[in-house]
C-alpha cells in the first residue's frame, strides 16, 4: 500500500532538487552582454574614459566641470531604461571620497581590476563602484533604489566591465 505513495513523493523530491543544480553560477564577475554596443568616449585633461553602451540605452557625454564631484571630473551618464530619470554616472575623478556612515564595502572584479563596491544602510544594490589598478580614479555612482536595478542591474555590471581608462601622456 505504501508503494503508490512513495513514487509521487520521490518524483516531487527529484523535481525540487533539479533546479538547484541548473542555471548560471554567480562568481562575482558579471556575464558579458551579447547586445550590440557603441563605444562611448569621454576625454578631459587627465585622460580618456571609454565604455561599451548597449544599443537602445541612452547616454550623455559630460565634459570637465559638468559633473558634481569636482571641476576636473568628466565622464558619461548612462540610462539603461529610457523611461527612467535615474542613471549611472561613470566618471573620472581626482578626488573621490565617501562618508563611512552606514557604508558596507565589498570587492568585485570588473574590467580586469579590483573594484571597491559601496552599499549604504543595508541596501541590496550598490551606490558606488571605485575602480583600482589600471582604471584607478574611475567611479560609477547611482541611486541604489533605481527602478531599472531589478531587471537590468546585472547587465549594467556587464557594461561597467567594459570600462577602459587611458591616462593623458
Where are these regions (language model features)?
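Secretory pathway targeting signatures of secreted, lumenal, and periplasmic proteins
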Residues: 41-98, 120-127
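Bacterial N-terminal signal peptides that target proteins for export
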Residues: 1-10
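Hydrophobic helical h-region of N-terminal Sec-dependent signal peptides
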Residues: 10-16
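Short, hydrophobic/aromatic-rich segments at coil-to-beta transitions
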Residues: 34-41, 72-75, 109-118
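Bacterial signal peptide processing site
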Residues: 23-25
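C-terminal motif of bacterial Sec signal peptides marking the signal peptidase cleavage site
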Residues: 18-21
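N-terminal low-complexity, Pro/Thr/Ser-rich intrinsically disordered segments
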Residues: 27-49
Amino acid at each position: 500500500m505504501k508503494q503508490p505513495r512513495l513514487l509521487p513523493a520521490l518524483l516531487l523530491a527529484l523535481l525540487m532538487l533539479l533546479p538547484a543544480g541548473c542555471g548560471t553560477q554567480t562568481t562575482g564577475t558579471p556575464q558579458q552582454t551579447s547586445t550590440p554596443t557603441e563605444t562611448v568616449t569621454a576625454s578631459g585633461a587627465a585622460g580618456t574614459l571609454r565604455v561599451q553602451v548597449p544599443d537602445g540605452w541612452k547616454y550623455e557625454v559630460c565634459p570637465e566641470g559638468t559633473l558634481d564631484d569636482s571641476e576636473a571630473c568628466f565622464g558619461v551618464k548612462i540610462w539603461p531604461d529610457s523611461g527612467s530619470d535615474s542613471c549611472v554616472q561613470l566618471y573620472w575623478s581626482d578626488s573621490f571620497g565617501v562618508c563611512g556612515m552606514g557604508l558596507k564595502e565589498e570587492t568585485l572584479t570588473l574590467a580586469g581590476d579590483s573594484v571597491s563596491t559601496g552599499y549604504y544602510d543595508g541596501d541590496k544594490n550598490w551606490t558606488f563602484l571605485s575602480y583600482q589598478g589600471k582604471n584607478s580614479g574611475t567611479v560609477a555612482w547611482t541611486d541604489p533604489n533605481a527602478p531599472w536595478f531589478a531587471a537590468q542591474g546585472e547587465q549594467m555590471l556587464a557594461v561597467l566591465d567594459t570600462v577602459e581608462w587611458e591616462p593623458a601622456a
